[in-house]
């Protein structure tokens, strides 16, 4: 992992150097002309970055140009490159590493451009679909990004280049990804406490709700619970709770069916949290939330709209550090 991080750091430095350059005194008309004439020759058996016109001096414009021409010199007719991850997959990782440098609209246009390039060959299209799934959807991917993945899924489910069973998988992913999106109201569900009392998420009155799906005894869950429980930004928010106003409620929900294990583990859960289980397995039965891995974290506002979806502890702490 350290080697992988080092590689990404080197890539980032190289890309920063690529998209930055000295100023130019050419007019806007000259710039448009020179950009239009920039040659992009396909180079076989390797990956070569596109030539960025020197007249583009703004780093944002250079990044946008790079993303909109990233694959222009790549030979999509050579299927042997699919079996060369040191070329194709490495170039793909370089590509998605640049996406945050531009606006979401420009990023989406670039993603569609990439799919269009890959669609020139069925096997390449399928390979790129797999890479997008691996890097944007896999819960363990450092590039995981549902907002980038959504427009791709919308294309995959309509593509005649993918096998029927693959389209079905992407259709399911699309259905789940469209639920509980950032800015939208989260799905309601019922949770049951140790006492046997049952409430709904929407009944929970708090300025913010940290929703955590976890399993008893799960090592990763234990680590996340410990980190959340000792988090200064979260503890500062919890300290603002009063009898008349709740700033932050942490709802730690067990979504599975081994209630005996949950009760056994309950004494180890933070007492200040709302520790509960899904008695009727409602979340699983109705597919209310996309729980790709355990634990999964959501941050909701007062109206139960999603602020952060399937997020990290760092993002949650950053939010409360700014807000409070």
Task: Describe the function of each predicted region.
Residues 190-209, 234, 240:
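A short beta-strand-turn-helix
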Residues 18-20:
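C-terminal motif of bacterial Sec signal peptides marking the signal peptidase cleavage site
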Residues 293-296, 302-324:
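Non-catalytic, surface beta->alpha helical segment in thiol-disulfide oxidoreductase systems
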Residues 1-8:
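Bacterial N-terminal signal peptides that target proteins for export
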Residues 23-197:
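Oxidative protein folding and maturation machinery
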Residues 200-230, 249-251:
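Short active-site neighborhood of thiol/selenol oxidoreductases, capturing the structured segment around
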Residues 225-267, 281-285:
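Structural microenvironment flanking redox-active thiols in thiol-disulfide oxidoreductases
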Residues 263-298, 302:
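Short, internal strand/loop/helix patches
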């Amino acid at each position: 992992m350290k080697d992988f991080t080092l590689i990404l750091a080197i890539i980032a430095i190289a890309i920063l150097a690529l998209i930055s350059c000295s100023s130019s005194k050419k007019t806007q008309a000259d710039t448009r002309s020179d950009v239009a004439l920039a040659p992009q020759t396909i180079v076989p058996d390797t990956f070569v970055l596109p030539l960025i016109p020197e007249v583009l001096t703004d780093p944002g414009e250079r990044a946008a140009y790079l993303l909109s021409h990233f694959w222009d010199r790549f030979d999509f007719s050579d299927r042997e490159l699919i079996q060369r991850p040191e070329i194709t997959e490495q170039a793909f990782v370089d590509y998605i590493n640049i996406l945050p440098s531009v606006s979401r609209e420009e990023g989406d246009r670039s993603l569609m451009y990439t799919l269009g390039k890959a669609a020139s060959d069925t096997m390449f299209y399928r390979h790129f679909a797999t890479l997008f799934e691996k890097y944007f959807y896999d819960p363990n991917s450092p590039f995981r990004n549902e907002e980038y993945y959504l427009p791709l899924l919308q294309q995959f489910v309509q593509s005649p280049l993918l096998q029927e069973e693959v389209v079905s998988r992407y259709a399911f992913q699309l259905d789940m990804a469209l639920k509980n999106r950032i800015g939208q109201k989260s799905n309601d569900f019922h949770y049951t406490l140790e006492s046997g009392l049952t409430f709904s998420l929407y009944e929970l009155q708090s300025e913010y709700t940290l929703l955590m799906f976890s399993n008893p005894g799960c090592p990763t869950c234990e680590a996340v619970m410990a980190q959340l429980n000792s988090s200064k930004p979260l503890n500062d928010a919890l300290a603002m709770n009063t009898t008349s106003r709740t700033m932050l409620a942490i709802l730690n929900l067990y979504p599975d069916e081994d209630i005996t294990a949950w009760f056994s583990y309950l004494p180890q859960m933070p007492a200040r949290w709302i520790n509960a289980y899904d008695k009727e397995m409602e979340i699983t039965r109705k597919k209310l939330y996309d729980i790709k891995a355990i634990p999964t974290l959501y941050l909701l506002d007062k109206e139960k709209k999603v602020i952060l979806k399937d997020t990290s502890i760092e993002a949650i702490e950053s939010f409360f550090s700014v807000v409070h």
